[in-house]
């Protein structure tokens, strides 16, 4: 039996990057084959199912763009060619059965059974009359009897199914169903029906997600806490990595000094507003400050380190994406600061010029992490040309050969991690994110670091994503963090006793 077009979760990392699940080597296939859930204990299967439910619920709540979409395998890929060959083989077999004398309806009956189940799954709870009608018109036993007597009218049933689909489908599928109505070949028609029904099931899933999202958001904290507690009861060591993560955060925060680069002088107004223990290492850190330091450390996480905190595993991909965006913003802001120092304020007062320069730099720095030297060579040349043309268009004095060479050199030096400008920008950005956690976005924007004003929009967007994600995590796992931190920070020394979000 062929399956209808499969769907996948949009944020499945194995699909999001390549458009299809990553192919496995023969060794990997054998290994994955040996680990079959059917061969595992019921407890393990139950745990996997619970984790899956928790992950999907969490995804719906924290990702407003979450939806299910159709998987389209690349036509020239091994998977694509294999799937197409298997589908064609089945439909050719169905055609042979229907054309045989007398006709063989074995496969057709199985297809009609699948169609019936799919149609019933698309009905809403109160559509009982339509449910009874489908049950009667596509009664499996009755169809089987008709097939045995050679009286199964496949074209008539297909037209009936098309009418039902037109009644039940979302407007976006009207055109697809109209095209099906023009198909006269019964095999091609059934094939088209199965495909569009698969899309309609996907539409129903997305409609359900959209409808239930407000309810899930209202009850997500309690639900995630309850599910995690169930998992913790079965596996008491489930917080081991979380404990290590918070222990490191406590160590990091006690070694910071208020005069260190982590508190840029240009943001002194924000330092003054930090709670006790936030910027003075002579006092013990508060549990909340330790937790926020831990959150910030996630943006520096080594991808090779498998000891990722269990309480944040569901957000690991999102945090990696935020870390990449942070890195890209650091490079972007560094480039803009260097370019402005050479071209002057007048040119950078032009929103059109700044937007054009930002767009160019963003596009060229996509591969900065993997090819830093080559990337910055391209960036330096392009930025130099943009600055030269911008000054010329505004009737300003263009850069001399000496200044142009210096501009190129300073831009290319951004490649180095120890580059002064890049280091300062990185510290400003992280300090801004820390203040977002402590004081919220609105207050943090009032004290926005002047050196980052050219990326205020992009950084504010990053800050919102990071703040909302960590706020939800703190609401769910705050009680667990508080319990762990009691053993890391002595209660008599701690500045506070809980880690509830502000």
From Swiss-Prot:
One of its GO terms (biological process) is protein kinase A signaling. One of its GO terms (cellular component) is sperm flagellum. Residues 1-36 are annotated as: Disordered. Belongs to the TCP11 family. This is T-complex protein 11-like X-linked protein 1. It comes from Homo sapiens (Human). The lineage of its organism: Eukaryota, Metazoa, Chordata, Craniata, Vertebrata. The gene is TCP11X1.
